[in-house]
């Protein structure tokens, strides 16, 4: 049973996050291992296993990128564990340029302003790519969706690096 079915959600990218959280909490209460304390060892182990599966399903579906990766995995495209390299050289060059720019910002005397501008540009790039990913998932153009997810992973990692740099530069103020 796939995670969407398990949690009673439609198998599509755009899901109701409140409904997802409610369904998760309801299932966690219903299948909590403590409710099986007086049952046989086998039933207790099954309850623990099922509660773990429910938790994994929720964690996967609540995060947009992991949800997209999961949807692709249901189509036989395993992005999460792939070793495939990116073939879009223009995108890779852009990523290298952005990383170099971020390194330069770290050592700049105007780091705060430069980082704010960089972060805004990066957020715009992420939003454009995210919107494209949603369209390709909705239209079930799986290969293009997979390419968008791969690129979003690069951008998400860069956003994390920006957050870490902000912490290093500005937490002392």
Curated annotation (Swiss-Prot):
GO terms for cellular component: iron-sulfur cluster transfer complex. CDD domains: DnaJ. It holds the Pfam family DnaJ. One of its GO terms (biological process) is protein folding. It comes from the Bacteria. GO terms for molecular function: ATPase activator activity; protein-folding chaperone binding. Residues 2-74 form the J domain. Keywords: Chaperone. InterPro entries: DnaJ_domain (IPR001623), HscB (IPR004640), HscB_C_sf (IPR036386), HscB_oligo_C (IPR009073), J_dom_sf (IPR036869). Signal peptide: none annotated. HAMAP family: HscB. Interacts with HscA and stimulates its ATPase activity. Interacts with IscU. PANTHER family: IRON-SULFUR CLUSTER CO-CHAPERONE PROTEIN HSCB. Belongs to the HscB family. Co-chaperone involved in the maturation of iron-sulfur cluster-containing proteins. Seems to help targeting proteins to be folded toward HscA. This is Co-chaperone protein HscB. It comes from Proteus mirabilis (strain HI4320). The gene is hscB.
